[in-house]
A protein has these predicted regions:
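N-terminal leader/linker segments that initiate helical-solenoid repeat arrays
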Residues: 2-126, 137, 146, 172
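Generic helix N-cap/helix-start motif at coil->alpha-helix transitions
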Residues: 46-55, 83-89, 120-129, 155-165, ...
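TPR-repeat structural position
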Residues: 67, 102-103, 141, 176, ...
Length: 342
């Protein structure tokens, strides 16, 4: 909560200082808002004196946590110059964006501040991005895509976060094919691997029933984030979808050895895969171990499954013992018969 509050505060401070007579720190000045080839910085516009005084008063009210007062002061400003109008709308939109329930109005003001294209380049670029972020937050996904693209076109910056959020907007729009390109760009641009674009990409293929491609992305996730157990499990399940039982077994076996398989149904899946891959002894052993440690319920059916696998592995004495346990729990004559045969 504190981090969120500080971030929102910084938005308002930035909105006030940019375009006002207050100087920014050298570090902020040195960061070019636009990196397009041949870009030349234009003349810096400053808000007019009359409007500036009222904006200063609103900012002081905001700093004293008199948010509603700040909003009232800014709302009453009747700016005449295009830059002053855009500047006030931007500042007011930034403040409203920090208040719950005022997202739509904030968006309206922020959009109006960039549509005229009179803000200074840094203000314009930051506002394009803020409009996109707020649109995503307000579930205005088409508008989010529009303004993320506008930000990229205006700045020529390659921002992995922007590409990830754009991919997310495409996902929410169910335009699954369109999210692949921004997701790939995000993956390539992140200095430290970020799971989000991988997951969006995987979801895109999965939703379109492109299961081989889904497996490919899942393999990338496991290789990039090997410590996250759930992805090993999901990769094993995805292999089953393309009927690659050997890779499914190998993957789930690693997951089991690393302690990633905890749910009974997943342990049973591993046991069944051993059986499918002609490894009945391992099938029986993994099931028996987890019945013994309580992860799998001790029922007649589960005991019979252990017995069947030991039977197939020609471990007749052990199989007979498990058939006996199954028979005692269920009084099923079939289990007694199988025990007798052995």
């Amino acid at each position: 909560m504190l981090k969120s509050t500080m971030f929102k505060k910084s938005l308002v401070v930035a909105a006030f200082t940019l375009g006002s007579a207050i100087a920014l720190p050298a570090a902020a000045q040195s960061s070019a808002p636009v990196v397009c080839p041949g870009y030349e910085k234009g003349t810096t516009n400053l808000v007019g004196e009359r409007v500036g005084k009222k904006v200063q008063k609103a900012f002081e009210a905001y700093n004293e946590d008199l948010i509603d007062d700040a909003i009232t002061i800014l709302s009453e400003i009747e700016a005449k110059e295009d830059f002053d109008k855009a500047y006030v709308n931007r500042f007011l939109g930034n403040i409203m964006a920090t208040k719950d329930g005022m997202g739509p109005k904030a968006l309206e003001l922020l959009v109006s501040s960039v549509e005229t294209k009179v803000l200074n380049d840094l203000e314009h670029s930051q506002t394009l991005k803020l409009v996109a972020d707020l649109s995503l937050q307000e579930k205005e996904y088409e508008q989010a895509v529009k303004y993320y693209q506008a930000y990229l076109d205006f700045t020529c910056k390659e921002d992995p976060e922007v590409y990830t959020r754009m991919a997310n907007a495409f996902y929410e729009l169910k335009q699954y094919d369109k999210l692949i390109d921004p997701a790939n760009k995000a993956i390539a641009l992140y200095e430290e691997p970020n799971k989000n674009p991988y997951v969006l990409k995987l979801s895109s293929y999965y939703e379109r029933k492109m299961y081989k491609e889904t497996v490919g992305v899942a393999e990338d996730i496991v290789n990039t984030f090997p410590e996250e157990g759930k992805w090993w499990v999901q990769l094993g399940q995805f292999y089953l979808m393309i009927e690659d039982y050997k890779k499914s077994l190998a993957t789930l076996e690693i997951a089991y050895d690393q302690g990633f398989l905890e749910k009974p149904n997943l342990i049973k899946m591993l046991s069944q895969l051993y059986a499918t891959n002609n490894m009945p002894y391992r099938s029986a052993k993994v099931l028996a171990e987890n019945i013994a440690n309580g992860k799998i319920e001790k029922t007649a059916d589960n005991l019979a499954s252990v017995a069947n696998s030991y039977h197939q592995a020609m471990e007749y004495e052990t199989a007979a013992q498990y058939y006996q346990q199954a028979a005692e729990m269920s009084s099923d004559p079939e289990f007694y018969r199988k025990q007798g045969v052995l």
